[in-house]
Amino acid sequence: MARTLSFQQAINEALDQEMTRDESVILMGEDVAGGQGAEGEMDAWGGVLGVTKGLYAKHGDRVMDTPISESAFVGAAIGAAASGLRPVVELMFNDFLGVCFDQIFNQAAKFRYMFGGKA
């Protein structure tokens, strides 16, 4: 019998399944771990929409809160991918994607050529 899931539940379940299956999958974003490990940590809400709720408890340090600098953590994810990890980045809202374009178009897109095909 088919299950009915909200988008939030489907994304959470897919992330959980893939992080369980593959240790190289990491998750980065603002408040995705609810400040876990920080002084005054709170119950992990799971990002602004609750999509990552419960993932820190299950996968620990592979779920990472980031500073409010989308370009920085997208750049970090690109570097992580170049080193063999499989990063998933949660941007709070699609409006913030534009500030990441430099990392995507001017950095990641040229890695192969900048590093002689070794990245």
Annotate each predicted stretch with a short phrase.
Residues 1-119:
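Thiamine diphosphate
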